Amino acid sequence: MSRYRGPRFKKIRRLGALPGLTNKSPRAIRDLRNQSRSEYRIRLEEKQKLRFHYGLTEKQLINYVQIARKAKGSTGKVLLQLLEMRLDNILFRLGMASTIPAARQLVNHRHVLVNGRLVDRPSYRCKPRDIIMPKNTTKSGVLVQNSLELFTGKELANHLNLFSTPYKGLVNKIVDTNWIGLKINELLVVEYYSRQA
């Protein structure tokens, strides 16, 4: 199953607000209370929210769930931490890109340095004390500056620091899962995959 490139509003109307997918919002959200929703549908919708918000393929999400199962702690919380510490998501949270697909494109087009080294993998797992900055070219700087101008006034995640001259982001610590701005029940996602196995 490939990455979703279709109409984004369709997914937002179905699943609710997904800030990583698009920064637009639908005019009116349908009332789904009259429809009966099976337990399977509820779990599937939670999984789809996670998948579309972070821009993952089904196979990538399965791999992250398997890694989270092997780690110590709550599988759901570890899964969210793994997804939040991806490079494309960190760029989105810092405001260097307006959406996660835009951040993914920045990384793929080789505009981003992590600790002074060029990284072209959006799935790169950032660690505490990583320094993320645009490449030392005018094009890279302009792309990041335009996104940061749109980002002004929004709250920065508590596990990140942003320095304005030169544009540079610092990962302070592993993300606290209570801070994630997405209404999701991660346990239902883990449950969905445990029933699939």
Swiss-Prot record:
Domain S4 RNA-binding: 85-161
GO biological process: ribosomal small subunit biogenesis; translation
Oligomer and partners: Part of the 30S ribosomal subunit. Contacts protein S5. The interaction surface between S4 and S5 is involved in control of translational fidelity.
Annotated function: One of the primary rRNA binding proteins, it binds directly to 16S rRNA where it nucleates assembly of the body of the 30S subunit. With S5 and S12 plays an important role in translational accuracy.
Protein name: Small ribosomal subunit protein uS4c
PROSITE patterns given in the database record: RIBOSOMAL_S4, S4
Recorded GO MF terms: rRNA binding; structural constituent of ribosome
GO annotation, cellular component aspect: plastid; small ribosomal subunit
Organism from which the protein derives: Cuscuta obtusiflora
Family statement: Belongs to the universal ribosomal protein uS4 family.
Gene: rps4
Family annotation (InterPro entries): Ribosomal_uS4, Ribosomal_uS4_bac-type, Ribosomal_uS4_CS, Ribosomal_uS4_N, S4_RNA-bd, S4_RNA-bd_sf
Primary site of residence: plastid
